[in-house]
């Protein structure tokens, strides 16, 4: 195993010869690696620009997945380094996101189910508020499109002409508007390009802005379960906007 390439909340990425291995934290179960490798392989089979998945390995009592190595910096890094090119990158991201949504995803888990489970489990909202959210979510469209789950510039690598999307554990089936709203939320919390990204996606797809923003209270409530430092206050404000 070679040098450490990246560190995430759930895993570390190391060089593995000419490839890389995503090595999960020691507490991660064997089925986590196999499940996520299967998800990635299913996305790869659709012809989307993702790294090839090669195998599941156990290394030093930790489970991991071996992928092709992707060269180049993330779009987030490139955007920070060239503010003038941000509109171009957002257009590329929007087109790529729409390309993902072009695929049906009947074999994937349900986006609304994932959101509902997270909303029901958060203790940061009282029971009446959770029930209001769950009732509203039930009336939102189901959809049958492939959704990335947390599509944002950190997980898109490489050249603007050949972007590669990495890290697919949250891939699911649902309404593209709900998926885009999740991206909008992440960008709103951590960058100042959320509105511009939303405009770019709406321009590419002709989906009304309001259709996407209708998902915002549900996306924000579900995000509370992830316990990301510094997000709680703003998420609660968005939830209470319902």
Stretch-by-stretch model annotation:
Residues 4-34:
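ATP-binding glycine-rich loop module of kinase domains
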Residues 12-15, 134-178:
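Active-site acidic catalytic loop and adjacent metal/ATP-binding pocket
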Residues 31-46:
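The N-lobe alphaC helix and its flanking beta3-alphaC-beta4 segment of protein kinase-like domains
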Residues 44-55:
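Conserved HxN/HPN-centered segment at the entrance to the catalytic loop
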Residues 60-74:
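Conserved short submotifs of the Hanks-type protein kinase catalytic core
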Residues 72, 175, 182-242:
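Helix-rich C-terminal or lid/interface subdomains of diverse kinases
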Residues 83-113:
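Internal "kinase-insert"/substrate-recognition segments embedded within catalytic cores
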Residues 102-149, 159:
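An alpha-helical support segment within catalytic cores of ATP-dependent transferases
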